[in-house]
Amino acid sequence: MSLKFLTPTGVQSAASGTVERWSQDAYVALLLRVGLGVVFVIGGWSKLSQLLDPARSDAIVALYTGPTGYINTFFLEYLFGVGSWLSPWGFLTTLSTFEFISGVALLAGFMVRPLALFYGFLLWTFVFSLPVVLTPGVAVAEKTYLAPALLVQIRDITLSGLMFILFNLGSGAYSLDARLMGSAVKRPTANWEHLGLLLRLSLAATLLVGGFFAGMANIKTFGMPALLMIAAGVAMLVDHRAARVASGVLIAMLLIYILGKISFEKSLIGNLNAVKREFALLAAGLVLAIRGGGELYTVPSIMNRAREALAVSRRQLAAHPLRFRVTVPAMILLLA
């Protein structure tokens, strides 16, 4: 005899809803793992192919440690200054090897939580270490970054947010971790209202920075109109239905941008490296379209809760007017 007939209907319904959420979160984890894993596989492969080629290794080291690279003077001296055993080539080769291997691990779903937590913080170091010149009146002899590092690297901040979402979700059912560790990682139980908010904030950050600062130096706009980016970013923050529409706009923008970056003069890895971050953004856009961004932290929901709280306060005032008359003056005296 089936046990479901012995289970109260409400419990059956709740269990069914929980199983559905587990299934959805498993697909969300898979999409994020693939999108983020591709970024690091491509990035690691691209750098290693140059670092391990004697004819090209000096050029890429000079690129990464130069004025248009990713390491400013402060960190160059810290990492490779007097007394340091590190060399720029050795540092970049080690980092690129780890980048490639960790990308493969994310794709396979192996050690996902530790990697996601590590990268969630590491991606912020690309902001701290970026060489920028922002002092008014200073003549810049060589081409470098002329915008605040946080704005230049806003896509990496978005990727950091995605990593923290993945850390909370775990590997998901479709992963090597699930095969090795069993049910402990097959059923993510994270609160999607919170993670959906982080997803919307992360994606909106890239869109709003691109929209509001379009035309300024080193700002990524994907070649899209500023007003379109602003509208999509605001929509993601305001309402859960509007966020889903905005996710469709983001996906279309990214696909157009990726296709437009294809060049037959570049190698396959060169083409992929030019749009590697966009693959993660594309995966996040798909997650938002499929799973949504939650309803709790949206403007309509917040306004409804505020109205309900105000209505409760009014009812309490009507029921206990004397208590209110005594309490409010006492509070005023305490604050005076």
Model region roles, listed by residue range:
Residues 2-101, 108-232, 237-336:
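Extended, low-polarity transmembrane helix blocks
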